[in-house]
Amino acid sequence: MAYSYTEKKRIRKDFSKLPDVMDVPYLLAIQLDSYREFLQAGASKDHFRDVGLHAAFKSVFPIISYSGNAALEYVGYRLGEPAFDVKECVLRGVTFAVPLRVKVRLIIFDKESSNKAIKDIKEQEVYMGEIPLMTENGTFVINGTERVIVSQLHRSPGVFFDHDRGKTHSSGKLLYSARIIPYRGSWLDFEFDPKDCVFVRIDRRRKLPASVLLRALGYSTEEVLNTFYTTNVFHISGEKLSLELVPQRLRGEVAVMDIHDETGKVIVEQGRRITARHINQLEKAGVKQLDVPMEYVLGRTTAKAIVHPATGEILAECNTEMTTELLIKVAKAQVVRIETLYTNDIDCGPFISDTLKIDTTSNQLEALVEIYRMMRPGEPPTKDAAETLFNNLFFSAERYDLSAVGRMKFNRRIGRTEIEGSGVLSKEDIVEVLKTLVDIRNGKGIVDDIDHLGNRRVRCVGEMAENQFRVGLVRVERAVKERLSMAESEGLMPQDLINAKPVAAAVKEFFGSSQLSQFMDQNNPLSEITHKRRVSALGPGGLTRERAGFEVRDVHPTHYGRVCPIETPEGPNIGLINSLAAYARTNQYGFLESPYRVVKEGVVSDDIVFLSAIEEADHVIAQASAAMNEKKQLIDELVAVRHLNEFTVKAPEDVTLMDVSPKQVVSVAASLIPFLEHDDANRALMGSNMQRQAVPTLRADKPLVGTGMERNVARDSGVCVVARRGGVIDSVDASRIVVRVNDDEVETGEAGVDIYNLTKYTRSNQNTCINQRPLVSKGDKVQRSDIMADGPSTDMGELALGQNMRIAFMAWNGFNFEDSICLSERVVQEDRFTTIHIQELTCVARDTKLGPEEITADIPNVGEAALNKLDEAGIVYVGAEVGAGDILVGKVTPKGETQLTPEEKLLRAIFGEKASDVKDTSLRVPTGTKGTVIDVQVFTRDGVERDSRALAIEKMQLDEIRKDLNEEFRIVEGATFERLRSALNGQVVDGGAGLKKGTVITDEVLDGLEHGQWFKLRMAEDALNEQLEKAQQYIVDRRRLLDDKFEDKKRKLQQGDDLAPGVLKIVKVYLAIRRRIQPGDKMAGRHGNKGVVSVIMPVEDMPHDANGTPVDVVLNPLGVPSRMNVGQILETHLGLAAKGLGEKIDRMLEEQRKAAELRVFLTEVYNEIGGRQENLDEFTDEEILALANNLKKGVPMATPVFDGAKEREIKAMLKLADLPESGQMVLFDGRTGNKFERPVTVGYMYMLKLNHLVDDKMHARSTGSYSLVTQQPLGGKAQFGGQRFGEMEVWALEAYGAAYTLQEMLTVKSDDVNGRTKMYKNIVDGDHRMEPGMPESFNVLIKEIRSLGIDIDLETE
């Protein structure tokens, strides 16, 4: 295999046994693809596909005026260029968006002509607001903050059949229901009641008999009965009654008389139940007619009206029960034929017939009125209104849309073959649904499982944005319709008709404040990726936390390979917010698909198919780990498979598909946990969630024991710098990398230079630090998509969330009681868990009623010492070390004029004392914060003079840009001349540049000429002259382009900033705070093993081994067995082996062994002990030495989930590293030097420091603010609150009898207002007595009792 630039420097020993059939797909594809579909930015007008914006426009346009004389048509749209790039948007706090311009055509028809002749056509581009753009990492910058739109998992449109699980009625009878859910529009429900009548609800309103809906659709009673029932035909001749026999229908009945065949042989005796055998005999005998007694008809229901043959009088309506009287009437009238409905109690119930009997309506109009009354209670119904309302409910494309998905699901469910069709319902659709529902009630067919992933689909960003956009357009449509009638008379243009505000507002609201538009979790690269791959069942049109039951939250068999069964939050959202599995993707309908390998006759092919949950149901799917031989045949007699959502075993020839990879079940975060297969699921859940909270450490350290997914996450997260094209590194420093692109990758007419600017010390959403460091050196060769610079939490292009710590599992002096963690001081000294946090502090100068606030260094009543870190503009220097209470930005606010005494006025007049009418409102460092100022940004309103600091910052930025552009030009020029040099070398000159004709060009000749003179050369070959001219023109164009770019940037920098109304100036100060690890910080491993640092011990006191190597961390062994996360123990053992091998390599390097010996040892490490084979032969000796140097600190290993290292392999690794195979060693107590009585498990575990730092949580209150009503101190760090002395604490003091302490707690320390002020004065005077008064709570209590109308007073003695 070919190794990338970083892989060559450090190969991970991989223990996986299964071949990689398919690479893990790009992890952010779900976001990027969806939004790309929505915008269709690159498409030309004729090539727009009917999705996204285009579809939204087409669904609303054309808009036709009420009179029908004018219409507004949609032609196409185009997206402009963004005003600022992403970084500028973040800095300025604006949205990264592009203007949307829509071309519309206004058509005015001639009123006079009969055939709508066109009178006038106007076409114009109309501005329709801004559309936010997605950055290349799948985020949006909205008002300067990075946000993510989370995908939503909602119920797919279509028709669903369900029952109430016997909960509605006390008898426990199952009441079946059907629900037609459209993409937008009214819901239609059919449901059975306990009496087995069918009812309909529209939009969950009052129920009506279902027959009302059928009548409203224009069906008569007879048609309804014909549709739902078959009929029995009786012939009457005189006193005799005979039935046209269909033998199947008699099954299960009791014979009321003997049944004979034509010869007179008795087939069924009277009183016997008719069985399947009898029916077979009847069919064989060919009995067509059956004479029955007259009573046989009684109780049956007529299928058609019975009419008097002579007079035409209706004797009985259809759907009437046959009674004795009716029979006598019929016999008298000499009716010869009666049709009755065929019903029975087993598989053909009389439900629709019964429903028709309770229905009060008798014709279509009455039915429409009944529906109108239900939808609009209290409004008087008219025929037109009722018809319009009913038509708009389900049959109007403007109000109702099933969508392509809905139609597909609908047709599949009711058994049609075609999957396309209209977006609105038809009569037939409604009847088919009712038929299916009745069939299910009759025991044919089953209800749907609503949690099946075939019935839930994913709505991604693009689709949700399109829906919002459509909502905005519909609002515009109403306004446009009204204005269109004026357009014809007043000659308006399209621009005058369309007001873009509602569209812009809808889009802004969606991106800014929708429940699914979330502030990006930017703790580390993994949390970013996970956030973008999240699928939520909450949000608009989804579930709510309170309503969601257990079933929705549970793991469903169809989640396999689509949604991760492990990664979900703990707490109220458990199971509602999920993560996509590693290989999952959505199909065109939004259903999640998982990849499988095709298996034919027991032979596994490399063809891959993606299947949704519906499509995979009938397949027999083998595990990825099923045993195969070299010919890829399944060799086990019985293979473990999944079939019909069950786990079972089948013969190899029955298998049709096979999993692609063992990690296709889990999400990205879970696939980063080594030995996941040995952890309990609950702890694995905590492990995946805690990796997302890891704070990037100062120096990232790759995990010694990983899973091989680290590289994918780091590459796809976008925090690393990835080469766009291959080439040679031209120059590299801390802030930029310049690549000279390979000739074969250069497009014609461009420079072939890629410049990558690195992000330095920037604040993330979670205040962690984003910083990139180059990995490459000048002259290195890189290929396309190699990683050239590490970002936060990445080490050589691999995700590195924590540090490898030497740990021992042992109870030690009680310091690690109950999950506490004991650390060595060495961890702090080496800055292993030191993190940098960047805080943004903002100072806003506003225009107040009393005058403008001013940012200045001239602050009243502040000593010189407090101002020594400010410049003349009153803003702190970059690089200043500041602590709590220091002034960062000096600001004064005008104070209201106070009434002055005449003496003061006189003094004012004499001394010109102005300082007293302003108050100090400077920005100070918040309490408990200490750090370094790393950056200052000043934003000034247009028209306000900029201060010296703002000008200095602007000059610095301009210099930076100029330097960048000059550098770019220098490289472009260099590259161009290099190419010319290789083309001209050895060619003959025709003259020019002071050279004689016939001179042959060599390097010396060219070095003797200045670059400008090269273009004066006339060569003998015309092609070369042309190349010279092109090169000259290219350089001139490039210079012009760069100058334009500079001017553009300069203009942007110099224009005023768009600030909120009333704001004159904003100063942002960025503080970098360094946090070392300390007691109280939360740490965790990757297996859900979390704890709090309890103590940091001196190195010399820590337990150490026989060589004197102390351990870094002591963990409690009692935390392992009950929690069943044994993965951490295996990780510890393998980590020890990895470290041991590294030390062995280090010794070999120190002894200056030859490269050949190193090669032999490395081959042994990588290829002798199981797992994937590495090809070390393609490495040169230098590369082998470089590799060995990078392995000194430990050989990194990969044990992929469900396909990892086996116990024997771990033992073999330990043996190879000359370490005990048990993974245990004898330790000595650092304090006493005594040996511990039994060997202890020692090894290396990857530990994370989580973003729950004691510095952010702990605070102390002196005197602070009080609650207005109760006068008690507030709570919480943000309010500078106190600790609540609660009910139980009061009981504790009562139990001790500590009366005075209790009195102090409940009075002067809480809400005795006078007492606490006195106390304060007393303490200041050095007098420590207290005089408790009445707590304010009593007054509150009295007021509450008075509010109940009881007058109560406290008597004072």
Swiss-Prot record:
Enzyme class (EC, first level): transferase
Coiled-coil residues: none
Q: State one molecular function term (GO).
A: ribonucleoside binding
From which domain of life does this come?
A: Bacteria
Keyword Ribosomal protein assigned:
no
Gene Ontology annotations of biological process type: DNA-templated transcription
Keyword list, A-Z: DNA-directed RNA polymerase, Nucleotidyltransferase, Transcription, Transferase
Task: Spell out the PROSITE patterns in the cross-references.
Answer: RNA_POL_BETA (PS01166)
| EC id | 2.7.7.6
Q: What are the record's GO terms for cellular component?
A: DNA-directed RNA polymerase complex
Q: Establish whether keyword Aminoacyl-tRNA synthetase is in the entry.
A: no
Catalysed conversion reaction: RNA(n) + a ribonucleoside 5'-triphosphate = RNA(n+1) + diphosphate
Checking PANTHER family in the record gives: DNA-DIRECTED RNA POLYMERASE I SUBUNIT 2 (PTHR20856)
| Family according to the record | Belongs to the RNA polymerase beta chain family.
Report quaternary structure and partners. Answer: The RNAP catalytic core consists of 2 alpha, 1 beta, 1 beta' and 1 omega subunit. When a sigma factor is associated with the core the holoenzyme is formed, which can initiate transcription.
**What function is annotated for this protein?**
DNA-dependent RNA polymerase catalyzes the transcription of DNA into RNA using the four ribonucleoside triphosphates as substrates.
Q: What is this protein called?
A: DNA-directed RNA polymerase subunit beta
Q: What organism does the record attribute this protein to?
A: Pseudomonas putida (strain GB-1)
